[in-house]
Amino acid sequence: MAEATAITVPVERTAPDTIRLERLLDAPVDTVWRYLTEGELRAQWFAGGSDARADGELDLVFEHDNLSSDEVPYPEAYASHKGAVSHEKVVRFEPKRVLAFTFGEGRNGVATFELFPDGERTRLVLTHSGIQSPTGGLDFGSGWSSHLAVLAERLAGRTVRNFWELHARSRETVAKALEG
């Protein structure tokens, strides 16, 4: 098989309040869809909680400690997110094609995941719109970039030793991408 993921668009700002990321994942659409919608699988790369359903509520439980295979300290800057639960609304649900839900209980816009088959792989396009914070592009871009990297590793059957180290590298990469 090819690499676990190809970063086709690291992150780009498509509007003042919108960022877009694109990845080519080494897994079929059916598998990627399950990792987006099933709480137990989503917990392995992003946030657990309830399963996503059409026109449903979506509880996201953020347990970033579970994303690292090594025991690593939780950065002070993100301590307020440890164990956080957010209650989101699924606003678009097209099985194996599109999942969109509010973010930050609606205060931080909408995250939309689009899936496109590419042979035995999946092209995932993530668009986060309605970002209100002036630093939101960097904050959400680095968060999504690091979480998508974890997803790619999980799909390849691998673990991530230190999520927070990955997040720090993602933040640097995203900052450079959004400058240009």
Regions found by a protein language model. Give the residues of each.
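Residue-level signal for tight coil/turn positions that link beta-strands
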Residues: P16, A27, D55, E94-K96, ...
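Terminal "cap-and-tail" regions of soluble proteins that handle hydrophobic small molecules
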Residues: A2-T8, E12, A77-H81, G119-G180
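Hydrophobic-ligand binding "helix-grip"
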Residues: D51, H64-I131
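Hydrophobic ligand-binding cavity/cleft-lining segments
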Residues: M1-D51
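Hydrophobic pocket/interface hotspot
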Residues: V32, R42, L58, V90, ...
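Short beta-edge strand/loop motif at the mouth of beta-sheet-based domains
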Residues: R20, G39-G83, F163-S170
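Short helix-to-loop capping/linker segments positioned immediately adjacent to catalytic or ligand/cofactor-binding
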Residues: F46-A47, F101, T135-G136
